[in-house]
Amino acid sequence: MMKPLNAPHRWGQALLLLCTLALGGCMSSAKSVPSRYSLAFDADRQVNAAAGQRPAPIKLRVLLLRSSAEFMDADFFSLQNDAKGVLGNSLLDSDQFFLTPGQIGKKLAGQATLDARYIGIIAEYQNLDGKAWRITLPLPEPTETNFYKVWQFSPDELEAHIVAGINGLRTVNDED
């Protein structure tokens, strides 16, 4: 003959079942989440000034890249005229805008794709001689989400401050 379960034992089983069901509701399948980026752009007051002339607006192109190799190997005019043809499958997305001389605080933020590993930036100076007209910024690796949403973390984010100066593009550390 079986002994009846005592009340504390039943409550323990009920609590265990309730916890199991509650955690099951928080479960999701693990997946990769692309990194995010937040870029701030400034332009020097004398940016894009040709010899003896006034400063002029400068066009910037921001490229989301699978690889930086093709970008760094290409010449300026090829990238300017046919970025898609030159970069091929390495180019995932692009954006462009102008900065006026002395402009500060232009923001560009977004989420990369899972394949994106770099952001390439091109500055279209009137005179390229000796200027750093391109830079690349490595993106954080995509984040693997956790099995339980209770412990979910946000993907890493690239934060960068880029200045279009008289000698070319450069990144600055805002903590200085």
Residue ranges of predicted features:
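C-terminal motif of bacterial Sec signal peptides marking the signal peptidase cleavage site
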Residues: A22-G25
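A short, solvent-exposed beta-strand micro-motif common in secreted/extracellular proteins
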Residues: A116-Q126
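Glycine-rich, aromatic-bearing surface loops/beta-hairpins
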Residues: R134-D176
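Bacterial N-terminal signal peptides that target proteins for export
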Residues: M2-L15
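Short coil-to-beta strand junction motifs in C2/discoidin
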Residues: G52-R61
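Short amphipathic, basic-aromatic surface patches that mediate peripheral association
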Residues: L39-A51
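Exposed aromatic-hydrophobic patches
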Residues: I104-A112
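Bacterial signal peptide processing site
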Residues: M27-A30
